[in-house]
């Protein structure tokens, strides 16, 4: 829904021609994201942007007191899209806390699962969600002049993807009717199958654990995976040149379009896909094994690689508030004062964070979002890093570091070479992603396409290494461990849309503090306490408008393209709290009406009547259709047997367990 409100002289902006335009919720993403803007239509520019989220999630609250071994099962439920990334990161965290190193084969299987997740998620988002922003129908409604030019523009790589003109590419992206749109849906099915082969279930893995995996590794398993992978590799040989043609055309058709979604190059990548020959998950060695990841960790500031050291990256994490619905934790307990290497840990580090929710009415000039504001301290400033939607930061950091060289992939210092082998219908192909001039909307989307090919190439390497282990008889996939009474752990990886870290403190064998920090808090963060805007806000405000529609018919396509280029996933935005049991000892989210609070300490009709007798009316018990005899209506369907929930009262029922006593509809044991 979009609302437009002409602003009067009392707006305080100094410009009476500004128009407020709001998109809440944003469609074709995951979760509850609202974008509130002020637009100057005379100068075709977005003047101000606020990014909001209206639902609180607080896994950090109800993780307290849990068995640490349950952490990956719980945190995978943070998201229904990339839950496996959370499960993986949680297992990394537990591996460090328990001091366990998984067998090599187990880690190769994890890598194969994560690579399949990258292929699946990037494909379905790029082609079936983001692609709609560039399809023929959308362009005809927002930029008919651009579509007319596309009809007469030959696609430079027609021989590779089969589409003669740019307009043909746009038509192929039309939802449900477009040829490429439908093909991508079929491909996404195969990639999910690849994931399930390795980790049992998508998106919440059933065979992934600290210490390794429960997957039984066989030659047949790897063959089933590789059969699907090679079809995906062939698909990539069509997809990469097709998107290059499409995105290059927008630069040509709309001079100045590089300014859309442009922000200062502040990119964070925590690295992903471990090399088990080097990774032991010990904090003291994290710098070394972090640099051996198949996606290199790194912070890129103004195009320069600041660090690839995971220890430095970890110590630089700061969680800011400012415009968020939380109270500060200044003065509360410090869980970790020094890391295992003796380095001081800041109070605003996730290890020391306390989550103190404070619900209130949205005020765009003060508090307006449930998202916190993660920042990275470089020694001078708390930088509002973004992930470039995930792939842009991953490729940029990996390219600059120049550490990856496995044949299928090579980082050169200024680019990443992706070497795809011969497939059924096409010969070997080499793609090269070059560091772009800008960190903007189109380059985030372009990088997403290239990273799909990157993940496929990496998976080929992982499959080969896994087969080496199996053929050598090293088929162990899991290592035993013990949970310590006291301990800390941190895990770093890349969720599909960017940086992901989990931070855990164990006391008395239970979780004392747990904070997951996924990519969307970084990207969707509101303005922090230092007045620094979050990446969505920063990328949108100040950008030009190229849409041809007038104010009354304005769709905001350029704004939507910018926001979606980050691959928003709002379930990941911050650490959902149901209420806690009264004796649990944990704080629950305050509710305007405590008696309607989800997960109240007491449940059921009797409890409801006790709490609010003036509002409670007993309800007749409902019968489930087709479930046994129905009084006054004759027997149920043939062969159907009576089913009834047993209650504690049955044990003292003189009529026998098969003959239920009539109970009042409001009885406590109903």
Report residues per predicted region.
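Structural preference for solvent-exposed beta-strand-turn elements
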Residues: 622-630, 634-644, 648-660, 664-668
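Universal eukaryotic N-terminal targeting presequences
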Residues: 1, 669-670
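Metal/cofactor-centered catalytic core regions of large enzymes
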Residues: 2-612
């Amino acid at each position: 829904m979009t609302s437009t409100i002409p602003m009067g002289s009392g707006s305080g902006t100094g410009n009476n021609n500004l128009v407020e335009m709001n998109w809440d919720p944003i469609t074709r993403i995951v979760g509850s994201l609202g974008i509130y803007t002020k637009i100057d239509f005379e100068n075709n520019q977005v003047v101000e942007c606020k990014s909001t989220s209206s639902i609180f999630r607080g896994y950090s609250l109800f993780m307290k007191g849990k068995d640490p071994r349950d952490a990956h099962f719980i945190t995978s439920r943070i998201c229904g899209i990339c839950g496996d990334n959370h499960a993986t990161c949680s297992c990394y965290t537990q591996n460090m806390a328990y001091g366990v190193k998984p067998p090599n084969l187990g880690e190769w299987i994890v890598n194969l699962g994560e690579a399949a997740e990258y292929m699946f998620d990037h494909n379905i988002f790029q082609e079936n969600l983001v692609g709609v922003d560039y399809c023929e129908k959308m362009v005809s409604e927002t930029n008919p002049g651009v579509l007319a030019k596309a009809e007469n523009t030959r696609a430079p790589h027609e021989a590779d993807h089969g589409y003669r003109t740019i307009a043909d590419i746009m038509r192929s992206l039309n939802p449900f009717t477009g040829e490429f749109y439908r093909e991508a849906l079929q491909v996404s099915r195969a990639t999910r199958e690849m994931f399930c082969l390795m980790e049992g279930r998508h998106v919440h893995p059933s065979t992934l654990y600290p210490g390794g995996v429960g997957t039984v590794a066989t030659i047949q398993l790897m063959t089933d995976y590789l059969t699907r992978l090679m079809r995906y590799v062939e698909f990539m040989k069509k997809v990469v040149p097709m998107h290059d043609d499409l995105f290059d055309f927008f630069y040509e058709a709309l001079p100045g379009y590089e300014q859309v979604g442009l922000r200062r190059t502040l990119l964070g990548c925590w690295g992903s896909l471990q090399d088990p020959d080097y990774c032991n998950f010990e904090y003291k060695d994290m710098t070394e094994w972090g640099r051996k990841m198949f996606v290199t960790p790194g912070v890129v500031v103004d195009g320069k690689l600041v660090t690839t050291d995971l220890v430095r990256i970890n110590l630089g994490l700061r969680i800011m508030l400012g415009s968020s619905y939380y109270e500060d934790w200044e003065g509360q307990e410090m869980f970790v004062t020094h890391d295992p290497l003796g380095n001081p840990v800041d109070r605003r580090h996730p290890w020391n964070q306390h989550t103190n929710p404070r619900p209130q009415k949205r005020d765009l000039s003060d508090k307006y979002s449930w998202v916190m504001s993660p920042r990275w301290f470089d020694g001078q400033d708390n930088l509002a890093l973004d992930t470039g939607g995930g792939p842009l930061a991953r490729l940029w950091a990996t390219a600059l570091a120049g550490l990856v060289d496995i044949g299928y992939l090579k980082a050169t210092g200024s680019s990443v070479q992706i070497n795809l082998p011969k497939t059924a219908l096409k010969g070997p192909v080499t793609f090269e992603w070059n560091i772009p001039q800008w960190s903007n909307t189109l380059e985030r989307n372009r990088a997403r396409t290239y990273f799909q090919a990157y993940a496929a190439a990496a998976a080929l390497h992982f499959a080969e290494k896994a087969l080496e282990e199996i053929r050598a008889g090293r088929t162990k996939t899991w290592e035993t461990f013990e949970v310590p009474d006291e301990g800390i752990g941190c895990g770093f990886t890349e969720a599909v849309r960017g940086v992901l870290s989990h931070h855990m403190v164990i006391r008395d064998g239970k979780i004392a503090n747990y904070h997951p920090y996924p990519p969307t808090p970084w990207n969707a963060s509101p303005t922090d306490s230092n007045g620094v805007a979050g990446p969505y806000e920063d990328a949108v405000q100040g950008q030009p408008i190229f849409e041809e529609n007038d104010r009354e018919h304005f769709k905001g396509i350029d704004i939507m393209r910018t926001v979606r280029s980050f691959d928003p996933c709002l379930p990941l935005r911050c650490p959902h709290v149901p209420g806690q049991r009264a004796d649990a000892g944990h704080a629950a989210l305050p509710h305007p009406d405590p008696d309607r609070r989800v997960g109240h300490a007491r449940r059921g009709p009797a409890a409801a009547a006790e709490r609010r007798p003036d509002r409670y009316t007993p309800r007749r018990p409902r019968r489930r259709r087709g479930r046994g005899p129905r009084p006054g209506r004759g027997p149920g369907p043939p062969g159907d047997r009576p089913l009834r929930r047993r209650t504690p009262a049955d044990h003292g029922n003189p009529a026998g367990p098969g003959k239920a006593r009539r109970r009042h509809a409001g009885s406590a044991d109903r």
